Amino acid sequence: MAKSIRSKWKRKMRAEKRKKNAPKELARLKNVLAKGSEVLMDDVKEIATVVPSKKINEKTDMDVDAPEGDSSKMDMELKRNKKNLRDQHGQYPVWLNQRQQKKLKSQCGKKKGKSKQAKKLAW
């Protein structure tokens, strides 16, 4: 779509306004951050301990390398029917939405029995 003259003019004026107000905005941001950092850090220190991100990353790396016996065991306990995705208690998985559940129910409801023989023509 073509850009109108009006929209070009508005865009140009907004850019000029940003240039004009940039120093004020920067000073205001610095002021807010200076005040906010003192107050927030004091509050956070009272509530919780501050831990550097490097330690947290190292900790998660160790957890990933460690064998996961409990979680894999739980996955094995749940036996799902591959055809209709139900588990042993008849529950659908959490990620399956209602529409898909309804569709699966209708597909499983149709039983494939012996097909009836077509009537033969009498000659």
UniProtKB/Swiss-Prot annotation:
GO biological process entries: dendrite extension; positive regulation of dendritic spine development
Tell me which family the UniProt entry assigns to this protein: Belongs to the learning-associated protein family.
Q: Which InterPro entries match?
A: LLPH-like (IPR018784)
User: Which residues does the annotated region (Disordered) include?
Assistant: 1-23, 55-123
Q: Recorded GO terms, molecular function?
A: basal RNA polymerase II transcription machinery binding
Location comes to:
Nucleus, Nucleolus; Chromosome
Basic residues bias locations: 1-21, 100-123
Q: Name one GO cellular component term.
A: chromosome
Is Protease among this UniProt entry's keywords?
A: no
- What UniProt keywords are attached to this protein's entry? Chromosome, Nucleus
Query: Signal peptide position in this chain?
Result: none
Query: Which spans does this entry mark as compositional bias, Basic and acidic residues?
Result: 70-89
Protein name as annotated: Protein LLP homolog
Where this protein primarily resides, as one coarse class? Answer: nucleus
- Tell me yes or no: is Nucleus among this UniProt entry's keywords: yes
